[in-house]
Amino acid sequence: MVIALCALMCMVAGCKSDPQKDPTNPDTPVTPVDPPAPTETLKGNIARPTWTTPTDYDYTSSMTAVLKVDLLAAYPELAKDYVLQDKDILAAFIGDKCLGVASPTDGLFYMYIVGSEGSVTLQYWSAYYSNTFVAKNAFEFQNDAHLGTVSKPVKPSFVVTGK
């Protein structure tokens, strides 16, 4: 787990004026998301979200992901404490509508994302921190897309939102 998080830290790139590319599909531009300012303390008091995947969509994509939570810059004293837990949740959203939910299995999140079109943002709730994190980048929904594999998972980077 620590190795996966370290590898993810090495892959983080800053926002540039040119559109970024989705590492799993270089032809798909990735839209940077402006994260909110970090909260005063990383330990939150946010209850486990009740995110669910709707069943009334005809189109799906799949994602295999390893998470990287960027704590080092804002919380250097806590960055070494990060722990992935079975009760953690990764969710995909288009706007404020939840379109996919997953919990970790052996350090990976296996998620089906339903929808039709739009910019997908990822949110992650940590049971350890009782806090919500948002992915630094969004991507466009594509029907039948397969983002990541067990051997090469997608590695989204997250920052704390505190909401």
Predicted segments — roles?
Residues 38-94:
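Short, surface-exposed binding/anchoring microloops in extracellular/periplasmic proteins
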Residues 11-44:
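Bacterial Sec-dependent N-terminal signal peptides
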Residues 1-13:
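Sec-dependent bacterial lipoprotein signal peptides
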Residues 35, 48, 53, 136-163:
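Extracellular beta-sheet/turn segments enriched in Thr/Pro/Gly and aliphatic residues
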Residues 124-135:
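Short acidic/polar inter-strand loop motif in beta-rich domains
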Residues 88-120, 124:
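Tryptophan-paired
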Residues 22-25, 118, 160:
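Non-transmembrane "mature" sequence context
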